[in-house]
Amino acid sequence: MKNLLGSSINDLENVALDYGQAAFRGRQIYNWIYNYRNKNKNIDQIEVLPLDFREKLKVDGFKVSELVIKERNLANDGTLKLLLSTEDNESIECVGIPTEKRLTACLSSQVGCPMDCKFCATGKEGLKRSLKASEILDQILFIEYEMNRKVTNIVFMGMGEPLLNIDELLLSIRSINNDFQISQRKITVSTVAIPKMISKLSAKSFQILSNCQFTLAISLHASNQKTRETIIPSAKNYEIKNIIEDCKTFVRETGRRVSFEYLMLSGVNDKLEHACELSNLLKGFQCHVNLIQYNQIDEVEFQRTSLKNLQLFQSRLVNNGIAVSLRKSRGLDKNAACGQLRQNAKSK
């Protein structure tokens, strides 16, 4: 352990003891990291620690932050997109989405993404690597400092496929819950759905977190297998009917309903027949549908569905007994909305 971010009180007490310090020095480090949320995440800034202890930690390579801000982009609606650089000079983006009572942090779990969904900017440049838990957590601290308020909600809907980084994902969730004091019920993990990984997520959550109270969101985006394969190449490996069965098992094991994300693409998946197919697919188990308007990116020719089609689609789902919401896009003027995050500054 060299990065202190993500460490528990016990971890930090042990660090202090290893250096011949009293255990309370570890608690001081813990308070400095999580309770004060300092921007200067530098060992030198922990002035409550003896100077010689700080120097030894620095010499031995301990640190609190690995990321550096490269760009800040503030949208007209108050949404903030940050372009961050890692120690190995890769780039990731994260987004702070404010409302009057909440600040939602949209976090990246990987540098890039291997899934290559046809409507999403992130996958156009492929996957570089997965993020460490400390790099995931650091995004929260930067959002909080830049927006001068505490994050209340977390969505893993930034760059990357979270279930392909499942161990670091769950370690970060454990720290978000235990150390950042954000309830699991205010955390959403979004996945395009990877074979066998939904059941693995449930099992590993009980191992690492002792329970599973976060929300699982499936990026479904289609009501039938043929359509899904045209917009999500990886869908060829995981049929919709199997995704639904695995989600039903997840609900039984965790007691948590599943959300299904459905991006409305004009002429592709927005007809009433698609709404009927989706209703039949989801009928009979605990779930919720989020309808999302498409956010334009340069490389593809998909178009937003009309507001009329969106409303008709929603009404048909409601009439068929499906719980549904319309998700409002935020940060559009700064390419900070769903599907628009990238690895570099081209997205400005």
UniProtKB/Swiss-Prot annotation:
Indicate the residues that form the catalytic site: 93 (proton acceptor), 338 (s-methylcysteine intermediate)
Q: Where does [4Fe-4S] cluster bind?
A: 113, 117, 120
- EC number of this enzyme: 2.1.1.192
HAMAP family registered for this protein in UniProt: RNA_methyltr_RlmN (MF_01849)
Lineage, opening ranks = Bacteria, Bacillati, Cyanobacteriota, Cyanophyceae, Synechococcales
- According to its UniProt entry, this protein's organism is Prochlorococcus marinus (strain AS9601)
Q: What is this protein called?
A: Probable dual-specificity RNA methyltransferase RlmN
Q: What is its cofactor? A: [4Fe-4S] cluster
Q: How is the cofactor bound?
A: Binds 1 [4Fe-4S] cluster. The cluster is coordinated with 3 cysteines and an exchangeable S-adenosyl-L-methionine.
